[in-house]
């Protein structure tokens, strides 16, 4: 059971990690955003700008899009500083798991999240996440992590038309973390 709070006194705002374009904008690289949007097969980016975009993308993959980590990067250009902030964010998420303890063990949520982080971009196998829990328990933990917005399941489909999920195969699934910097 989740704690209650006063109705009408809370304004909900859903926030997500910054996109790559927002990351570029935060780094005052609006010119790169514009060039990237205008580039196509007929008018490709100049090699120098392409290299600069690749470098920024590599940084983005490490720093991620969490606003505090991005701000730390802009101020310090220090990956260690960003890493400390990312660790604090993960610990905050894990501390929050206790509010789900009536439905799922906080240890199971923690184990599932760490297991997902150790299989980035790979087909998820629940046994690799943990041999200590049943698949149904891990599936429920993944469902709660998805509802919380911490992970994004990507389900394979062999559909050739609409709707694509008509031939979805949930046994062949990858699970992405909400932000690459938190890996």
For every predicted segment, state its role:
Residues 2-118:
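Interdomain motor-coupling "hinge/lid" segment immediately C-terminal to the ATP-binding subdomain
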Residues 70-183:
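Accessory nucleic acid-recognition modules appended to NTPase machines
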């Amino acid at each position: 059971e989740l704690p209650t709070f006063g109705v009408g006194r809370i304004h909900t705002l859903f926030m997500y990690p910054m996109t790559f374009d927002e990351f570029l904008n935060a780094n005052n690289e609006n010119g790169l955003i514009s060039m990237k949007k205008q580039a196509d097969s007929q008018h490709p980016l100049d090699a120098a700008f392409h290299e600069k975009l690749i470098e920024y993308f590599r940084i983005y993959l490490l720093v991620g899009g969490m606003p505090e980590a991005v701000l730390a990067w802009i101020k310090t250009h220090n990956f260690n500083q960003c890493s400390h902030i990312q660790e604090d964010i993960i610990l905050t998420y894990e501390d929050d798991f206790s509010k789900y303890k009536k439905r799922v063990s906080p240890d199971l949520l923690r184990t599932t999240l760490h297991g997902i982080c150790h299989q980035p971009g790979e087909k998820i196998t629940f046994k690799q996440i943990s041999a200590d829990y049943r698949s149904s328990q891990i599936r429920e933990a993944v469902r709660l992590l998805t509802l919380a917005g911490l992970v994004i399941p990507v389900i394979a489909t062999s559909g050739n038309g609409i709707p694509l999920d008509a031939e979805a195969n949930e046994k062949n699934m990858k699970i992405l973390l909400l932000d690459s910097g938190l890996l």
